[in-house]
Regions:
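Helix-termination/interfacial motifs at the ends of transmembrane alpha-helices
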Residues: 2, 7-10, 14-31, 144-220
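Glycine-centered small-residue hotspots that permit tight backbone geometry or close packing
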Residues: 128-129, 167, 229
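Large intracellular
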Residues: 3-4, 8, 18-152, 225
């Protein structure tokens, strides 16, 4: 479990919520005022920012990109730890087996490793494919998997771009309604709330959810696996 990711979210949202709740007493002291939290909850703003961002992502990416979200969250919060030394020992072990018992003996040993990339590599060797061709095939597979990982992180980077944009759309909607109903004092504050809160939602969604997920996912794929295999 990656406690740093959990801690980052807790600290981030915690600081924001506490800052919203903090009020100042007449004597200059600070106190928590729960009623202040109501001003930051606005259903139309939520619909504009969250609904608009999801809709834009639906237009931009196929369904399989959304289906991968649980898998990506698992990688971020529960990353697998790999020991490079273990892979070196496995390769040396397979090399010794091939030298003593022949290449075909490696087929029975493949069950001892769970890494798909390593298994595929050994199978290519067992099939007596030329070394240059094996190297070419493996490099091509690595390039394909790396490109797929780039596309996976692009989903969240795009989300971090769309969220503030829809926050600005909500701000424009609120300002238009505000200017169109200046004589109606009952809706004046509501339209102003929509104008400001949507920007707030968009910035939070982009900089505390989408962009951190994209950066952490990229880091996990680069540094916590021996090969881009997921």
């Amino acid at each position: 479990m990656d406690f740093l990711s959990f801690l980052g979210l807790i600290v981030g949202f915690g600081c924001i919520i506490i800052s919203i709740l903090m009020g100042e007493t007449p004597d200059g002291a600070f106190e928590l005022v729960p009623a202040q939290l109501q001003g930051f909850f606005d259903l139309p703003s939520i619909m504009i920012v969250f609904g608009g961002t999801i809709a834009a992502l639906m237009v931009s990416f196929p369904l399989k990109a959304f289906a991968k979200i649980p898998k990506h969250l698992k990688i971020i919060f529960f990353p697998k730890k790999y020991n490079p030394q273990q892979y070196i020992e496995q390769i040396v072990y397979f090399a010794k087996e091939a030298r003593i018992n022949g290449l075909l003996a490696l087929e029975d040993k493949l069950s001892e490793t769970k890494d798909k990339f390593l298994k595929n590599s050994i199978l290519l060797v067992v099939d007596s494919i030329e070394p240059e061709k094996v190297r070419s095939l493996l490099n091509r597979e690595l390039e394909y998997l790396e490109e797929r990982h780039v596309q996976d992180t692009a989903f969240y980077y795009k989300g971090s771009e769309y969220a503030p944009a829809f926050g600005m759309i909500g701000t424009l909607i609120g300002l238009i309604n505000l200017l169109a109903n200046l004589e109606d004092t009952a809706t004046l504050t509501k339209n102003m709330a929509v104008a400001l809160v949507t920007t707030f939602y968009g910035v939070i969604l982009a900089n505390l959810i989408f962009k951190p997920i994209a950066n952490k996912l990229k880091a996990c794929l680069l540094y916590t696996s021996p090969s881009p295999r997921d």
